[in-house]
Amino acid sequence: MLSQEFFNSFITIYRPYLKLAEPILEKHNIYYGQWLILRDIAKHQPTTLIEISHRRAIEKPTARKTLKALIENDLITVENSLEDKRQKFLTLTPKGHELYEIVCLDVQKLQQAVVAKTNISQDQMQETINVMNQIHEILLKEAHND
């Protein structure tokens, strides 16, 4: 069935990609899960635990544990909301922003090297991105309707 092959194709590239990205993250003393949350904060700051959990489709306790490590490593700051004391806003520290920029450059070099070894056109990449974004939105909606 084509739809099964379609989804399996995404799954099959995930682990090999992680194996290539891990040395970059290890060099900067950050785990992949931490990197994903740090990147999410960088793109959406200020943000909250709940917003991160929703966007990343992860449980709040998992996000909380990862955020704790990022705070302990002085990569993010937490500020209480003036309107709602229960709400806390997360932003990158200068150290976190510097790490984000450095890791982004290293990961981008890796990604460009992989793409250069293929015959994928810019249009094909953009179409794939569009399709994956559509699927991601649907999956998030489905997950939150449970």
UniProtKB/Swiss-Prot annotation:
InterPro entries: HTH_MarR-typ, MarR/SlyA-like, Tscrpt_reg_MarR-type_CS, WH-like_DNA-bd_sf, WH_DNA-bd_sf. Keywords: DNA-binding, Transcription, Transcription regulation. GO terms for molecular function: DNA binding; DNA-binding transcription factor activity. It comes from the Bacteria. GO terms for biological process: response to stress. Residues 1-137 form the HTH marR-type domain. This is Uncharacterized HTH-type transcriptional regulator SAV2265. The lineage of its organism: Bacteria, Bacillati, Bacillota, Bacilli, Bacillales.
